[in-house]
């Protein structure tokens, strides 16, 4: 039911595109002059529209200025239409579609798709929306479904409200802007386009994108519906400009024919006086009948070219827009009343009918009093408004003007006349009703006859089409079976490949684990070595302290002994001092040897640097010679080309001379024949013989002179050709020689380059050795200083010890030598102390050696530590690469799974092509239940189980790789102990899956009622998945 009628005019907007490159190169002028926002002047004549857009207007400005309001109207229950009309290459498709996925350049259709859902999400949550779209084109005056290319000749019918619609057109239910854009992309790829002289992407058909929106208030049960037609008309063409021919020419004829029918409809509606509007002249005007003068709010874009080259077409387009601006539409809300509203309306109409019946009864009573000759006073008469209402209600009942005349007749005759009048009135009413019924029946039969004719034609076409497609469908059935077998085989191969990849990933994981274990062992070894080094250092320090304490104690004992013994000389450990001095000398010799080696290495490095500079200089000289040779070769090649061209011209001249020679020979033969004729004639005419001889001699002399000149010219040309040939041969030899020299120079250059590379490598090695020698030199210098300090300290201690012992011995000798028995014990004690001193000296020497060994071992340990750190970094990099490889394999397998899902979905959708669609309700304030990866909201069971098994294996790998990152897993509560034990090949292990409740759950679906794909006695357990939220 429709109510709330509003009369509105068609909104006409004019848009000019910029001059294109071809028009700029042709020098066309920019002819429009813009006056304000609603007027443009072409050729001195102003044209006024609702809005005029100059060339610098952006797509967003166009949409906000005129197309945004129509979205609100459609959501409020009105029908809407947006046209794009104009000549070819005027920017219609750019205005309607633009670049679909570019936020700046997208046209009206993608912006409307986005805006519809933005409005829905901001509306009351009690509203539920059902949105379906269809996309078709009118090509060669045939309706072709762009979403199902097998439907090539659809027919136009009318619904119960006599609104035209395309029967059998594919309708897709959508729940997000991305799904609408996917539908547009699919239809756009099937639309007919061609290349013409005026447009590289010329549309060869009229496209209509229909959005049907139905909404229902869940509380009040009120239902509204609105349709939005988005029409991109093909441009009118002038064959002389587009250069159309062949099939493109036939397309242009049909385009111009349908646009002419549209112009006739616009003209008939603009005049307003014609009772017949030719909607049926074209299928396009038939489909858009409601948009032109019907129940719709229509906006028309007239797209124009600003070039002076298209002046006539631009004026015609502007005049078309002015005519369309005068058309009036009657837009009304498409409202379906609820039972309560129908009840209220029925009660209201019932009360109105009751009041009208009471008024009629009063009027009939007053009329009967007048007919009876009674005079009705004014107080008893009905009021004017009630009388007018009664007249409106009873206007179908004719009243005799003479009935108010008072006639005195008998009551019986009056009653007889009244009955006769009532009978006649009743017959008259019956006849009127019968006439109306018959006229309605005639109209209905006419319409049924037209519908039957159309149905007969379409049925014949459908019958032929069905007969043609029957065999095609049989072949397609066989092909589909083969494709199913191929898909199953591909799935089996994919399963085998997945097993192999899984094994490879497990091997990589094991290798990574081994490397991690090795790394931990290396780290533990390094820590133990560090602790051992620290312990040795502590032991060395402790021993040094002990040696110092022992020396101090020894000094005390010797001082006491010198007091007791006297001035006896003490034998010093000369062998120890000699050993220390010998070791020090060996160290000095080793250091001097290293210095000499370093000097020789530095000298060798300098020589190599000089040699490298010399090689670079030679390479530069060789490069310059090579470039000069290449220049000389290019010059000789140019000279050879010029000589070749000259030879060709000489050959051509020679050919011309030979042709002229042949023509002269022919002329000579003709002259000889004529001479023979003349000789014969001269025999008859002897008086003229002398003249003929003179003529003959003259001709012979002339021919001889021509022949000699020709021979001279031929000889001269032959000589020139021989000279040029010699020159060419010499140049070829020279070119070959230069080519050989160039190859030789290139070989020398490559050789020098390789030598330079080898020398640079050696230089790098020597530099590395030099750096190592410098480091060793520094280490040895430090070691030498440390040893020198230790030896100096030890030498000083020995000197002090010897001096102290000597002084004490002298003092003890000066004392009384009476106790001779104690001297022997004292000597034994001195020898004991000397032995202890010798042992301490050996221990000190051993500690110095150990220290030197540790210093030598320290760089090795540091190098090993660096190598271990590098190994750790390499292992970390390998681990990271393994993770990335696993993720890439995961994405690749996911893409393969999506492709297989799409193939299975396409097959299943092809099988259920004629079944009912399931609407996907859209609630305001919520996001769609489906995602871009799941556009139809369903998944085949095979793909569900296979995808779940894939993701479960990836979860296990991810758990092995990163056991600590449990918050980023795709699954929860993974039952890793359950394995697949089903049979039926590699594919069956991925297809047979169940949960505790026996249902398989798709990871991209938020439903839990999908049936399991394959039933078996022993099914593998399916891992429970997280349910996706509506926002994802």
UniProtKB/Swiss-Prot annotation:
Effect listed in the UniProt record for changing residue 474 to H: In ALS25; uncertain significance
Biological process per Gene Ontology, one example term: axon guidance
Compartments, record wording: Cytoplasm, Perinuclear region; Cytoplasm, Cytoskeleton; Perikaryon
Keywords: Acetylation, Amyotrophic lateral sclerosis, ATP-binding, Coiled coil, Cytoplasm, Cytoskeleton, Disease variant, Epilepsy, Hereditary spastic paraplegia, Hydrolase, Isomerase, Microtubule, Motor protein, Neurodegeneration, Nucleotide-binding, Phosphoprotein
A GO molecular function held by the record: microtubule binding
Effect noted on mutating residue 280 to S: Strongly reduces microtubule affinity; slightly reduces gliding velocity
Effect of residue 361 to V: In SPG10; does not affect microtubule affinity; does not affect gliding velocity; does not affect microtubule-dependent ATPase activity
Primary location: cytoplasm
Coiled coil feature spans: 331-906
Keyword Acetylation: yes
Region (Disordered): 906-939, 978-1010
Tissue: Distributed throughout the CNS but is highly enriched in subsets of neurons.
Disease: Spastic paraplegia 10, autosomal dominant: A form of spastic paraplegia, a neurodegenerative disorder characterized by a slow, gradual, progressive weakness and spasticity of the lower limbs. Rate of progression and the severity of symptoms are quite variable. Initial symptoms may include difficulty with balance, weakness and stiffness in the legs, muscle spasms, and dragging the toes when walking. In some forms of the disorder, bladder symptoms (such as incontinence) may appear, or the weakness and stiffness may spread to other parts of the body.
Domain notes: Composed of three structural domains: a large globular N-terminal domain which is responsible for the motor activity of kinesin (it hydrolyzes ATP and binds microtubule), a central alpha-helical coiled coil domain that mediates the heavy chain dimerization; and a small globular C-terminal domain which interacts with other proteins (such as the kinesin light chains), vesicles and membranous organelles.
Protein's UniProt name: Kinesin heavy chain isoform 5A
